Amino acid sequence: MTGKYMPRTVILGVIGSDAHVVGITILEQALSAAGFEVINLGVQTAQDEFVSAAKSHDAEAVLVSSLYGHARQDCEGLHDELDDAGLDVLTYVGGNLAVGQSDFEETQATFRQMGFDRVFDAETDPEEAIEMLREDLQLTTTEAEQIRVDG
């Protein structure tokens, strides 16, 4: 990278026993194209793997995907583990988060209460999530543009 801005590091993975890989592959490509350094943990990722990766890569955000409807069970306690490790990172969760999910606002509220900064459904455009990530990381327009140019 030739510019003065370093890419922001994000951890990405599919939590729990979920083996859906397509969504995180699309997210990884979109985030990389937007200039982020992406550490993709892949599928069937345990909470401690997210925590370990965030710590070892000095990540600024942990992005959790789940499409099989059991995200609540899989994510329970994740923020306690992040806190115990002394990490202060943004956390996003997205996908088909609950079996039979009919009221996404209720699902959002549940995950916000669990400590997630942003909650997305499976229909969210990756660019929307990236724009929110830039906003939450307080990237200036100049920095975001530089990341895109140099990335």
Curated annotation (Swiss-Prot):
Residues binding adenosylcob(III)alamin, per UniProt: 17-21, 65-67, 96-100
InterPro entries: Cobalamin-bd, Cobalamin-bd_sf, GlmS
PROSITE patterns per UniProt: B12_BINDING (PS51332)
EC number(s) from the headed UniProt entry: 5.4.99.1
Pathway: Amino-acid degradation; L-glutamate degradation via mesaconate pathway; acetate and pyruvate from L-glutamate: step 1/4
Catalyzed reactions per annotation: (2S,3S)-3-methyl-L-aspartate = L-glutamate
Keywords: Cobalamin, Cobalt, Isomerase, Metal-binding
Complexes and interactors: Heterotetramer composed of 2 epsilon subunits (GlmE) and 2 sigma subunits (GlmS). GlmE exists as a homodimer and GlmS as a monomer.
Descriptive protein name: Glutamate mutase sigma subunit 1
